[in-house]
């Protein structure tokens, strides 16, 4: 690794530790030329499948888009950021577990709805009403009835 101080190629690892619940490695390094010390963080780069939208357009998976949709549904609801992040991580893990290089956006939407159903029923109804394009109050009632079963 290049030294950020003198740009030398020769650095050595002094200490390594697992951080972020074992998802990252923190390394203390020392430059063999200028002897400055610095910290690096290393984590696995996991490839997410491309998303095939309902109109057939393919686009890279966008975690921010996923997070924004979930947060919008949970707006002003009593759900912690930690629980939201756990849900996002479960969704991403499920998508990677398919082993597919491309995945339909409908599958992502269904995973989001399942997570919201566990987190907050009101947020689930909010998301479902937009995702499934509810036309009238009857559709809300039908979805609420399904939730109560």
Curated annotation (Swiss-Prot):
The keyword Transcription applies. InterPro entries: ATP-cone_dom, NrdR-like_N, RNR_NrdR-like. GO terms for biological process: negative regulation of DNA-templated transcription. Binds 1 zinc ion. Pfam families: ATP-cone (PF03477), Zn_ribbon_NrdR (PF22811). Residues 49-139 form the ATP-cone domain. Keywords: ATP-binding, DNA-binding, Metal-binding, Nucleotide-binding, Repressor, Transcription, Transcription regulation, Zinc, Zinc-finger. A zinc finger (unnamed) spans 3-34. The keyword Transmembrane helix does not apply. Its cofactor is Zn(2+). GO terms for molecular function: ATP binding; DNA binding; zinc ion binding. PANTHER family: TRANSCRIPTIONAL REPRESSOR NRDR (PTHR30455:SF2). Belongs to the NrdR family. NCBIfam families: transcriptional regulator NrdR. Negatively regulates transcription of bacterial ribonucleotide reductase nrd genes and operons by binding to NrdR-boxes. This is Transcriptional repressor NrdR. It comes from Tolumonas auensis (strain DSM 9187 / NBRC 110442 / TA 4). The gene is nrdR.
């Amino acid at each position: 690794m290049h030294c950020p101080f003198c740009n030398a190629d020769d650095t050595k690892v002094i200490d390594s530790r697992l951080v972020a619940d074992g998802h990252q490695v923190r390394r203390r390094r020392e430059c063999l030329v200028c002897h400055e010390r610095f910290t690096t963080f290393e984590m696995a780069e996991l490839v997410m499948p491309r998303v095939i939208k309902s109109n057939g357009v393919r686009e890279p998976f966008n975690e921010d888009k996923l997070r924004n949709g979930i947060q919008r549904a949970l707006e002003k609801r009593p759900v912690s950021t930690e629980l939201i992040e756990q849900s996002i991580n479960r969704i991403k893990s499920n998508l990677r577990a398919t082993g597919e290089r491309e995945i339909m956006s409908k599958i992502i939407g269904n995973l989001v709805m399942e997570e919201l159903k566990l987190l907050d029923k009101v947020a689930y109804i909010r998301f479902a009403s937009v995702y499934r394009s509810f036309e009238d109050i009857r559709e809300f009632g039908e979805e609420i009835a399904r939730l109560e079963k």
